[in-house]
From Swiss-Prot:
Region span, Hydrophobic: 30-141
Residue ranges, annotated region (Disordered): 1-24
GO cellular component entries: membrane; monolayer-surrounded lipid storage body
Family classification: Belongs to the oleosin family.
Region (Polar) location: 1-29
Name this polypeptide is given: Oleosin 14.9 kDa
Provenance organism: Arabidopsis thaliana
Taxonomic lineage from the root: Eukaryota, Viridiplantae, Streptophyta, Embryophyta, Tracheophyta
One Pfam family this sequence matches: Oleosin
Annotated TM spans: 38-58, 60-80, 81-101
Membrane protein topology class: Multi-pass membrane protein
Length: 141
């Protein structure tokens, strides 16, 4: 009976500690969330304040120097675009030549040789056909 009573008391105390732990855990989670959220909110406010101050200082300078800055920015953008396009076209050309070289000297070279032979035989057939037509035309005349 005493064992059953202890077991019952232990069960009650375990239940109460298990209930206390989730509450404490929830409180720690809430405190951590509030601390992290508050810190991020303060950093966000400081960033906003810095941006407003920087715009306040920079706006008059941008207005004064805009006749010089706008063409300079456009020129720099065009130069950068030109260099990037030139590099892209160069890479495309190198890739095409590399593929062509590998295809001509590698496994595709026999296909190209066969195609060249077929074209050559067609040219010979065409020349022979034209010669025969010319001979027939001369014989008819």
């Amino acid at each position: 009976m005493a064992d059953q009573t202890r077991t019952h008391h232990e069960m009650i105390s375990r239940d109460s500690t298990q209930e206390a732990h989730p509450k404490a855990r929830q409180m720690v989670k809430a405190a951590t969330a509030v601390t992290a959220g508050g810190s991020l909110l303060v950093l966000s406010g400081l960033t906003l304040a810095g941006t407003v101050i920087a715009l306040t200082v920079a706006t008059p300078l941008l207005v004064i120097f805009s006749p010089v800055l706008v063409p300079a920015v456009v020129t720099v953008a065009l130069i950068i675009t030109g260099f990037l396009a030139s590099g892209g076209f160069g890479i495309a050309a190198i890739t095409a030549f590399s593929w062509l070289y590998r295809h001509m000297t590698g496994s595709g070279s026999d296909k190209i040789e066969n195609a060249r032979m077929k074209v050559g035989s067609r040219v010979q057939d065409t020349k022979y056909g034209q010669h025969n037509i010319g001979v027939q035309h001369q014989q008819v005349s």
